[in-house]
Amino acid sequence: MVSVFQETWNEGEAAMAEFIKLPVGIENFEKIRRDGFYYVDKTGLIEQLLNNWGEVNLFTRPRRFGKTLNMSMLKCFFEIGTDQSLFDGLYISKNKALCDAYMGKYPVISISLKGVNADSYENARSLLKRIVMEEAKMHRIIMSGNRLDDIDKAEYMSLVTGEMGEDTLVYSMKTLTALLEKYYEKKVIVLIDEYDVPLAKANENGYYDQMVLLVRNLFENVLKTNSSLKFAVLTGCLRVAKESIFTGLNNFKTNSILDEEYDETFGFVDDEVKEMLHYYGQDTHYETVKEWYDGYRFGNADVYCPWDVINYCDAHRRNPMLPPENYWTNTSGNDVLKHFIESAGAAKGLAKTDLERLVNGEIVEKDIREDLTYNELYASMDNLWSTLFMAGYLTHKGRVDTKRFRLAVPNREIRNIITEQVLALFKQDMEKDGQRP
């Protein structure tokens, strides 16, 4: 899809500014459209999702590739009471039959588990309860009128008081879907963003088994044999093994960076980047942007990291002479990379040689496992290669066979990040050696 920036949005404000604002750090679709920010049109995702139909759909992409913005867009499209003008001029608006059938027609439950980041299981569970409670409050309209009986209303109140026990918590989202279906007489769409963050944080802090059980029960209840469910979409960075938290979900479809379907719906493709650079008068920066931020291979598409491109354009609007930066590394830690480099150093062998080859722009061949659990990520060098690939530190240059891929560092930014981590750990080792008697 190409970019869309409508004159119909805040014409007076746009007239005062030389260019439409760039949405640096903004992941809310309604805000981007209503406040006149530059938007790269990804509404084709809606059409693909409905045409390829899956009752439960999981999308995995590295961080900062537009997952949260796409989920916000899905909510705005399907939710009852939506402002349909948000989609004026966008790709999906051309499909009038689809818009008439689906736009603004369904109750939507939308939660993000990004905030479930705690040092203990008890605190993580409290955070999860808070997220469910806040989402339930967004649907307080169902308490009006007499569509729900007193028992239904009591069930709803149990979700918004913040006093729910674990039994209530694991059934909370299923309960909310049932109440919404009864009120609206429509099946419910469920959106769960950053589904795997609670598992990642639990693994880091020593309560992984407890969190797996909680998340499995929560998801199983709302996603498996739930007669109130229209369909669900989940996003995350890694595809956790189905046996871990998606046990028994026969209605489950996954889409990863290796799949051809949806390969242009997360991240920017070349034409989108060229159009953005042209609009902001940065055509001469194209080769630099491509060298630094392109190089990812999703399905059959060559993809740029949108976070990098937007930040680069924004910075160079103010100062065209700025050198490129490693924008991606500043968004979170690089724990996966640190684990890998430390393990490669400890191995003193092939892994270290492979790392040197990658930094030098060469290709290595490795088997890739997509179905790891979080407590397996660092268990072996083979698993670490898979983790680096899925997390966006490596991309593929083609298959050798079903599970074996030709891997490479995607771009200069990632090469710099890897080099910086290697040098930092080398410096630590030198300092330790200097302290030894």
Predicted regions and their residues:
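Phosphate-binding site recognition
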Residues: 2-437
